[in-house]
């Protein structure tokens, strides 16, 4: 019974409350921080559980009154409302019981790379970056372009955006994958629709304690920053390229004004990429024969199509099609896609865990 599964949450919440009133524990700042964080994580389940148990009690009380000559009709009507509340709370609680992704509250690195399609892919990479920036602004996230390589006709061959804010990873993790665009390029005189693609990677920002890098595994090269066509734009060796020798991962950064800043930024991106690589390897080992319908970073899979002539955006993972591509891109209204993706992922998680 669901109620029996919820009681340990109430017990643990009360235990923590008691501990946080103990002077001995209050003198240990790190322990207080740890317990407070645990209590905050339990609180939504605890509050929903208290409501749920109250509804169950009221249901039993009204059932006992059904055969009462004076209160029977009123009890039946109240019972209908209580059962609706019960079902609603059960759904809310099931979602709350889904194991949390440890990365959900982290900041992210959002990496966009132009793929097939040449200049048009680079231009769309720029358009998608602008849309993500608008989305971040709507959500109250702070953004910073960490690294960029501009396309010869505009847009970007590659751009890395740091997105800071509570829940940034939880909202944007579903954006990882191949994004296909179908539209008529400005340079197309015959009006033909061209298809191009870009890839998006979503990587959580990693704390130093979460991943260890052996300095001997790194090759660090410094050079002068370059602009369009490779021409030098700096008279000092401020650009930094870091190669992780065991994996072959390479990160280059030249956007900062100093070599130190560029190295620091490049190391952050490298750590995120290494963590991303490790997570992929771990998930590959754990993955059952039945793959998740909603991926959260598989760059090999086409996840979404942006069809400009039809004003259509389609997310292929959940077969969602919206005919308001212009509004979504112009306003950064990605929640219209992200919310259904999250709901689908939650339903999948509930089915798997048999909550």
UniProtKB/Swiss-Prot annotation:
Xref: InterPro entries: PCRF (IPR005139), Pep_chain_release_fac_I (IPR000352), Pep_chain_release_fac_I_sf (IPR045853), Prokaryotic/Mito_RF (IPR050057), RF-1 (IPR004373)
Record-linked Gene3D superfamilies: 3.30.160.20, 3.30.70.1660, 6.10.140.1950
Domain of life of the organism encoding this protein: Bacteria
GO molecular function: translation release factor activity, codon specific
Pfam families in alphabetical order: PCRF, RF-1
Entry keyword set: Cytoplasm, Methylation, Protein biosynthesis
Comp. bias (Basic and acidic residues): 280-293
Region of interest called Disordered, as start-end residue ranges on this chain: 280-307
Residues with PTM N5-methylglutamine: 231
A GO-annotated cellular component: cytoplasm
Subcellular localization, as worded in the UniProt entry: Cytoplasm
Entry function: Peptide chain release factor 1 directs the termination of translation in response to the peptide chain termination codons UAG and UAA.
Family the entry assigns: Belongs to the prokaryotic/mitochondrial release factor family.
Protein name: Peptide chain release factor 1
Gene this protein is translated from: prfA
